[in-house]
């Protein structure tokens, strides 16, 4: 019987070397309101690239499932150079959903600017990339709803990536 209430998930496999679907977990990148994000790679060796694997928290509910499904659908519709890409999505053997996203090696935009003591012109060039990503999302009728420095990463070459559409609205 299916329940709409909270469902506990076994998190004993959520450690480096553990498997979630076809992905092997390498290290935890962060923890947020919906769950955790892990650096991962395909365990079967296909698609030799690292991904940011987004997983729900230990107690799973229908509402959280719907939010993850909405994020999946939103990301699938957004292909833009300044928005982290969705590569794969699915569920593992215990029914835990996952999103395999572009792994962006970068720093939050505020840290990037501060550590480099960027001039105003350079900061505005970064902000323009953010604005282009947001405008593109808006053109697809998507509102991010969680724009903050930790959701805007800047790579070593100065490219911006907008992350985390977890509470976005269509």
Q: What are these regions, as identified by a protein language model?
A:
Residues 5-170:
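Conserved ATP-binding/catalytic core of the eukaryotic-like protein kinase fold
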